[in-house]
Amino acid sequence: MDPECSQLLPALCAVLADPRQPMADDTCLEKLLDWFKTITEAGSSLLLLQENPCLVELLCHMLKPQDLSSRVLSFSLRLTGVFAAQEDCFQYLQQGELLPRLFGEAGPLGGAAWTAPTVRSGWIQGLRSLARHPSALHFLADCGAVDTIFSLQGDSSLFVASAAGQLLVHILGLSMQGPADGPPSLQAGDWPACAQKIVDHIEESLRSAATPQITQALNVLTTTFGHCHDPWTRVLWVRLSPLVAGLLEKDPVPAAHSLVDLLLSVARSPGLSSSSCGLWETLAQTLSRLSPTQAGPLALGILKLQDCPQALRAQAFAVLLQPLACVLKATTQAPGASGMVDGTAGDSVTVDTLLPSKAACVGLLCRTLAHLELLLPLPQRPCPWPQASLLGAAVTLLQLCQGSASPTSDAGRHLCALLLGCVRVQRAALDFLGTLSQGTGPPELVTEVFAVLLEYLRSPDSSPTVLKKAFQATFRWLLSSPKTPGCWDLDPQALLFLRELLPVLQKRLCSPCWEVRDSGLEFLTQMTGRWGGQASFRHALLASEVPKLTEQLLRDPESYVRASAVAATGQLSSQGLCVSPASPEHLGGQQKSPLSELLHILSTDSEGFPRRAAMHVFTQWLRDSHADVVGDTEEFVAGVLQVASQDLDWEVRAQGLELALVFLEQTLGQPGSPCPYAVTPPVVAPARPLAQALQPLCRVRLFEFAFRALFDCDRPVAQKSCDLLLFLRAKTASSSSPQEARISPDVASVEAALQRWQAGDQAQPLGDLEPEVVLAVLRSMDLEGLRGALAESSDHVEKSPQSLLQDMLATVGILGENEADCY
């Protein structure tokens, strides 16, 4: 510990021990505890206490009957655990009876402070810290702490209850590390005392008729098998598995969700051989005993396992598919035909679960669709995969929700009434349908997919979120449409669908709901980016009003829509698909180009989102050599940087630096790698003098923009500028000739201006800079040091331990105002 901190520590301990003093907030106490943890991890806790006796006095003061702050008491309990984690310091604290009086029945356990959850939490965390050596185990057994931990598992505070369960797992693991001659015996008498007590309590809880106690026991076991993988865990499972299996004989099965978590934790544990401990049989029995809602997560977990018997995988997949099989069975006209894999025809239990209420029906279907969506991309997904049946089920669900299905059975009509207009199922089914686009399907089913998507996009009843997901699913299915080898154009079926879709998109772009307009523009941007160069798509799009509407939406009252319109316009313009109508200001026929429109938005829009979108478009245009840019690249870059430098949004300024970097790379050129198989080496163009190469950068005032950004008040902008200038300096250093390196122009005026900028006075511009001056300034600047300073947190000075102690003392007036840092 620093001498300065040692001098401040006695005063701070006196403040903490005095209940009359105003107490520092929890953040200060947490930082103080972290500091002590750092000290004890690096050195001796015993030496720390001996050199700073005020710490022991503080802990002893907690034992006096007084009106202590619960926060300070909790802090002291945790601090004691930090010190006692080292065995020699533990023995030192034991000699003074400090540990039994703090953590035993004579301590906070019997006082009024125990009613505060923060004290109970501090007690648990203190024990968690000190339980690291054999002496701690004997202490826990002797002071009765384990029994208290058992009771805290049912604490009213969820944080305390969870911490108690985790502490039991930690103590159990520490106890079982004792035997060095192999795993412990199955005989109860051979288990260490603490471990035996915990396992006995778990056994008693599993035999209990009270569901909360069963849940607590299952949660402890789940954490144990999830974190402990030593051989003794197999012994533990063999001992307790009959009691776990016995839970399946109860009706209903208690704590089903916790039981599922435990079984999956055991199945994933590398310390267990599932085939030799009866786990597969227990999993199969559990699948058959749980309700469909409870069994879904278990079935998904089983199917995610790498090594699992095929029969169990088939059973789990059948359980997962049952709700969708019921949907198909209830709506199909062919009796008994669900189309799913064997064993999923839709048993009576699942039908009863689906139909009683809308909440049960919707919840089960949404969970089933989510589970299948997670399973689809996995390499261990079941094979064969019933792609056609799942497509049919997803389409049927969407039709039921839309009211376009015509079920003939009573169950089907009931299901239709439950799902009609259900947005939750619509969203889940559209997500699942989009994921299914990764596979193939019969042509007639694909036609149904496009039909139901078009139905949703057309329907006035579709909510904005449903429409967004319908657009997303539509794009994914268009991407997956069959293609002719060597041709990326849309196939005839997709093209026919597109011609029906564009009028719908036109209508959605005119929607009074801004979320719908925004989703339509995002969809248009995706479509144009993918098929903008294809003749069939171009012809269909230009024959519609979509480009004109997109241009009009650049002036939408909602900023999110304007931003999406900017992105769509950028994509349309890149593909030559923009239609520029006469502007309202020039009715005689003068037209505005997309570049002029977006520059106007960058200069005048009152919201940040459209301006950011414009900067992204400009950067992409420069990178792709857009037609409007290559005509006069320097004028384009200079104009954009001039506007961006004055923008109040730091993201716009940062994107301006990205554009500057692209221009810099294009101007100086990136060294390319010659083809190793070329017959003759490529002809290298003679390199231009460095000063000549930098002239375009000077003409667009790129350096003034970068230097100004270097002292930006927003750190991300300054960091990006620093990286750009470091890149430029490295680039020029490798390209400059010895003669250029020896040139030493007068840079005093530029450096003086930069110093004023750094001080906050950026009113005076740098003016025209010559390349030689720029190179000299770059060589003289400590950019590496600046980058290091920018990488530090804004409060790195005030985060020191000395500053923390001063601030805590200043809150009670012990230090003068000028002696404390503010952070």
Swiss-Prot record:
It is found in: Nucleus; Cytoplasm. GO terms for molecular function: ribonuclease inhibitor activity. Component of a multiprotein complex required for the assembly of the RNA endonuclease module of the integrator complex. Associates with INTS9 and INTS11 in the cytoplasm and blocks the active site of INTS11 to inhibit the endonuclease activity of INTS11 before formation of the full integrator complex. Following dissociation of WDR73 of the complex, BRAT1 facilitates the nuclear import of the INTS9-INTS11 heterodimer. In the nucleus, INTS4 is integrated to the INTS9-INTS11 heterodimer and BRAT1 is released from the mature RNA endonuclease module by inositol hexakisphosphate (InsP6). SUPFAM superfamilies: ARM repeat. One of its GO terms (biological process) is cell migration. The BRAT1-like motif mediates inhibition of the endonuclease activity of INTS11 by forming hyrogen bond and hydrophobic interactions with the active site of INTS11: Cys-822 coordinates one of the two active site zinc ions of INTS11. This is Integrator complex assembly factor BRAT1. InterPro entries: ARM-like (IPR011989), ARM-type_fold (IPR016024), BRAT1 (IPR038904). The modification Phosphoserine is found at S744. Residues 100-200 are annotated as: Required for interaction with NDFIP1. Part of the multiprotein complex composed of BRAT1, WDR73, as well as integrator complex subunits INTS9 and INTS11. Interacts with BRCA1 and ATM. Interacts with MTOR and RPTOR. Interacts with NDFIP1. Interacts with SMC1A and PRKDC. Zn(2+) binds at C822. Its main location: nucleus. Belongs to the BRAT1 family. HEAT repeats lie at residues 495-531, 544-576. Keywords: Cytoplasm, DNA damage, Metal-binding, Nucleus, Phosphoprotein, Repeat, Ubl conjugation, Zinc. It comes from Ailuropoda melanoleuca (Giant panda). A motif (BRAT1-like motif) lies at residues 821-823. GO terms for cellular component: cytoplasm; nucleus.
